[in-house]
Amino acid sequence: MSCGKTHGRHENCVCDAVEKILAEQEAVEEQCPTGCYTNLLNPTIAGKDTIPFLVFDKKGGLFSTFGNVGGFVDDMQCFESIFFRVEKLCDCCATLSILRPVDVKGDTLSVCHPCDPDFFGLEKTDFCIEVDLGCFCAIQCLSPELVDRTSPHKDKKHHHNG
């Protein structure tokens, strides 16, 4: 798939992918017992209703935006994120919620690269951005397990024999 080529009803492969992501999320949120979209989200696992994803511009760069600008919500600081959840889709325009990147302690990170060594997981937020999906050339879905990921036991990494 390359930019600018026709890929279905929306004539944009990113639009088609986001439409499928939204359908999967909605199927889980409605607790649909039988559905066609079960490869990423499992309706029997409570709380897993988000397929996080990255989007890339037409030059291959990661799209990023900011959440909690001014630091007005809760005790969260302003953060930059490259991680999104689709909330609404109309034609090729989408409302994306900004997922908050956190470290293993649950502290807010500003993440501009998915392989940042401090990045551990994602938290859903109420911060949203409206985007024209036609401005993007690629999308990468990530594991739903990243959202509300629980901290591993610290004892697992270092074992000392007495």
From Swiss-Prot:
Disulfide cross-linked either to itself or to CotZ. Disulfide bonds: none annotated. This is Spore coat protein Y. Keywords: Disulfide bond, Sporulation. Its main location: other. Pfam families: Spore-coat_CotZ. To B.subtilis CotZ. GO terms for biological process: sporulation resulting in formation of a cellular spore. InterPro entries: Spore_coat_protein_Z/Y (IPR019593). It is found in: Spore coat. It comes from the Bacteria.
